[in-house]
Amino acid sequence: MTAEDAPMPATSRAHNQRTVAGYERCARDYAAEVGSTPSPEGAAALRQLADAVAPGKRVLEVGSGPGWDADFLETLGIEVHRTDVTASFRDFQAERGKRCDRLDVLVDDIDGRYHGIVMLYVLQHFERAELDAVLGKLAQALEPGGALLLSYAEGDEECWQHGDSGDYRVVRWTREAFDARLAQAGFVPAWEHAFQGKDLPWRIVLARRQA
């Protein structure tokens, strides 16, 4: 049995479901809070992805949320397949006339191949033991040389953040540990940007799948 085939431990599954439940209750408030225009850091990262993917090629977005990043990528000529595990976000996008499919990257297979994948502000909600399987799954879904844009919270702590809508799992990574996992999955970092967010330090990485 490979890491991709291994079932998710019950504790990990419960932690993820607890986090998703929080987002189910706050999707509209979250959409309003983050705003429809990407932050300067986010816009720069999305442009890096667009530059790495030929116009008209398909990009998979994992954790599309309200869909603002996908909207921005589409203005750059990128075709985006939006996905999210949270029904409230999918419903929000449907009301905007956007199709967002259900995908739980922790347990679901990814159908098809893509020239790019974007997964921003998602990985911090996954347990440490889940990262290898997720990265392996993303690598399999990318064409050789394809681009992966993702972000993670820097540090080495694991904690819960508690809000009015629920509890959110946060797992942070050191740069060295995260890059080692990327390399193990067959990715080579090509661009990065580190910045201080509202509550946590973040790093955004654009990595290429080795041919």
Where are these predicted regions, by residue range?
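A conserved beta-strand element that flanks and buttresses the S-adenosyl-L-methionine
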Residues: V118
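Conserved acidic residues
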Residues: H115
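Helix-to-beta-strand junctions that scaffold the AdoMet/dcAdoMet cofactor pocket
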Residues: F126-R128, L142-E143
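Short catalytic micro-motifs in class I SAM-dependent methyltransferases
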Residues: Y121-H125
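Class I (Rossmann-like) S-adenosyl-L-methionine-dependent methyltransferase catalytic domain
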Residues: M1-G112, E130-A133, K137, A147-A211
